[in-house]
Design a protein with these regions (language model features):
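Conserved phosphate- and dinucleotide-binding cores of soluble alpha/beta proteins
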Residues: 3, 7-149, 216-395
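N-terminal active-site beta-alpha-beta segment that forms phosphate/nucleotide-binding
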Residues: 145-231
Length: 396
């Protein structure tokens, strides 16, 4: 079993993962020949070390610059890895270029407000009309400068994606430190915000945000009324050290060993983002997604689910195209792993996947087993998912 280290994080990883040099080494096709990662041994244990990449130019956005080039981020929706990128470019002999909204005289920025020192900034461009994000001009409740105590969010409309999120939400425990991934998992955050129960948990996003009303869609990674903002590399240090109780993440493919692929789908490179760091280090991982994809048709009513047409693309396959989450490593670390779909819930067992629950109205053979490339374990006491999950008048 292998761990992964870089200049700022160490993550529990397995040689099964596509980033291991004995597998793909993070390379996406045969044309990519340069080594990106190597195996090293520390205290008798194997790690994966990502090789440093020289950065020629870093184009970054801040809020305010003083005459010396010190940069503050008070209006930004997240700290992200802005400092790390600037430092990497500077230390590589590259250029660091910042766009800011305003420029102030020397000494007007307090030392505590400066997030990027002038020593590593080469160029400052002032744009008084810069937007907070491409969708929002400026919202001080997102940057954490002000609280919006009148904020109210509506529960998302019913859909099968919401039904999946409802079932996944039942895995929460009060006081958990949690992470929500993009897509179906972020609907869990929307439900918690609409219910007013979000403060029962410590919600985090890998961009560095803690607490608040997590935003979804194109604004994923931001929050209104956040309680804390740290740099993304520090957030991943926390994740890699085992700080997450539960992570809710999406999936593209799942195989019989519990491996998950999100990084290469139908031959198209999507990339893992922070998925590996989060999934392989959380104590509990709840994968959320539709059972199949492309063209599936459903009917719901009276707490029942009916599949009128299966999807054209199977997600439960004999072998995933690329391993972004290792079931083998999860077993080694005693992680609790669930796979939640609209029609079935699985869990990772000692050697394979076990079917835990099926949706009311679903035919086990026709709607589940015939739509999979492998046969999961099926317990004698197979349970039925709560019918309320499929009620379109339920708010959470």
């Amino acid at each position: 079993h292998t761990r992964l280290v870089s200049d700022w994080s160490s993550d529990v990883c397995s040689s099964d993962l596509f980033v291991d040099p004995q597998k793909d080494g993070g390379r996406m096709n045969e044309a990519a020949q340069d080594p990106l990662v190597e195996r090293i041994t520390i205290d008798g244990q194997q790690y994966l070390r990502y090789l440093p990449l020289p950065v020629d130019v870093a184009l970054l956005k801040g809020s305010t610059a003083d005459e010396d080039g010190n940069i503050s981020l008070e209006e930004e929706p997240a700290n992200l890895d802005i400092y790390a990128m600037a430092a990497a470019a500077h230390n590589s002999g590259g250029k660091v270029i910042f766009q800011v909204r305003r420029k102030v005289p020397r000494g007007k920025l307090s030392a505590r407000s400066v997030r990027i020192p002038s020593a590593i900034v080469d160029v400052v461009v002032v744009d008084p009309d810069q937007r907070q994000s491409y969708e929002i001009v400026y919202d001080p409740s997102i940057s954490g400068e002000q609280r919006d105590d009148q904020l109210s969010l509506e529960a998302p409309d019913f859909s099968l994606r919401l039904a999946i999120a409802r079932r996944a939400k039942t895995e929460l425990r009060e006081g958990d430190v949690i992470n929500f991934g993009f897509g179906i998992p972020d609907q869990i955050a929307s439900m918690l915000a609409a219910e007013g129960t979000d403060e029962r948990y410590y919600q985090t996003i890998e961009h560095g945000t803690y607490g608040g009303k997590l935003l979804t869609g194109t604004l994923f990674g931001y929050a209104r009324n956040p309680s804390c903002m740290i740099d993304a590399p520090s957030q991943f240090d926390f994740y890699s050290g085992g700080g997450l109780d539960t992570a809710f993440l999406g999936f593209g493919q799942i195989d019989q060993e519990g491996n998950v692929n999100v990084s290469k789908l139908d031959g198209v490179t999507v990339g893992p983002g922070g998925f590996i760091d989060i999934a392989q280090n959380a104590r509990k991982v709840v994968f959320c997604g539709t059972f199949d994809a492309k063209g599936a048709k459903f009917e719901t009513g009276h707490g029942q689910l009916s599949i009128t047409r299966p999807g054209q693309i199977r997600k439960f396959v004999e072998k995933v195209d690329q391993i972004t989450f290792s079931g083998k490593q999860a077993r080694f670390q005693n992680q609790q792993v669930l796979y939640v779909t609209e029609r079935a819930v699985f869990r990772l067992q000692e050697k394979e996947l076990e079917l835990m629950e099926i949706a009311p109205g679903i035919d086990l053979q026709k709607d589940i087993l015939d739509q999979m490339d492998f046969l999961p374990l099926i317990p004698e006491n197979l349970k039925t998912m709560d019918a309320s999950i499929f009620m379109d008048d339920q708010n959470g």
